[in-house]
Amino acid sequence: MNETQSNEQILKLFIVSDSIGETAQRMIHATLTQFPDLHNVEIKKFPYIKDEEEFLNILNLAREQHAIVATTLVSESFNALGHQFAHEHDIPYVDYMSDLISIIEKVTHSQPLMESGALRKLNDEYFKRIEAIEYSVKYDDGKHFTDIGEADALIVGVSRTSKTPLSMYLANKGYKIANIPLVPEIEIPDNVYKQKGLKVFGLTASPQYIANIRKNRAETLGLSSESRYNNLDRIKKELVYAEEVFKKLNATVINTEYKSIEESAFYIEKFLQPKL
């Protein structure tokens, strides 16, 4: 260590927030990257500030230690107190929230929530959505059955009744969805029938409608359009089997013929608890 470094004054930064303080912390770290030669930096966090006495104690400590105060406080009274104290005691004070809130409110004529931790709430919603998508991908098309009881809903139906698109649409809204294709020759595992309280939705459509979709799908894949997959009699047999499964699972039946994914999802959501 050279003499310059040893004599370098410690830069002290206080992060004060009525939530976790991650917004100010990110801003400070982003700013400090502009000072790569600055090594003696001390950052202290004071999260979840709820009363003015506690806030004043922190401001007094900042005054004594010659610290810069960076805040993300939603409370107008806290912000007013902080600005006043900093002005009276010559404390370097950065308010990351109130100025921008005021400007956006003025420009848009919209009322802010004035809610602490709104970003964290948004992040929580994001991670819940990711978790739901990961679950729904894992349990798509009958790939897994082990934790199927964790699903918010189970969707069953024959091929080309929109099971996967509907599952992914609902997953993006925070719902964990499992879906199982119904094929007469392949039995559904017993543990699926034993699930208690699992909401089940059976997707169906007319034989001719499904046949047309399957024919188009086969042609897209470069397969023969005249195959067992899109044979009308075969599809009728699959639908009879599907009806039997719907009854066993006490499924709510949805006819997806000429329905958009949004329409079917809207109907299913009426039976589910709101997620996000």
Curated annotation (Swiss-Prot):
Protein source organism: Staphylococcus haemolyticus (strain JCSC1435)
Question: What family is this protein classified in?
Answer: Belongs to the pyruvate, phosphate/water dikinase regulatory protein family. PDRP subfamily.
Its EC number is: 2.7.11.32, 2.7.4.27
**Record keywords:** Kinase, Nucleotide-binding, Serine/threonine-protein kinase, Transferase
The protein's name? Putative pyruvate, phosphate dikinase regulatory protein 1
Is Ubl conjugation one of the keywords? Answer: no
This molecule's function is given as: Bifunctional serine/threonine kinase and phosphorylase involved in the regulation of the pyruvate, phosphate dikinase (PPDK) by catalyzing its phosphorylation/dephosphorylation.
Top EC class for this record: transferase
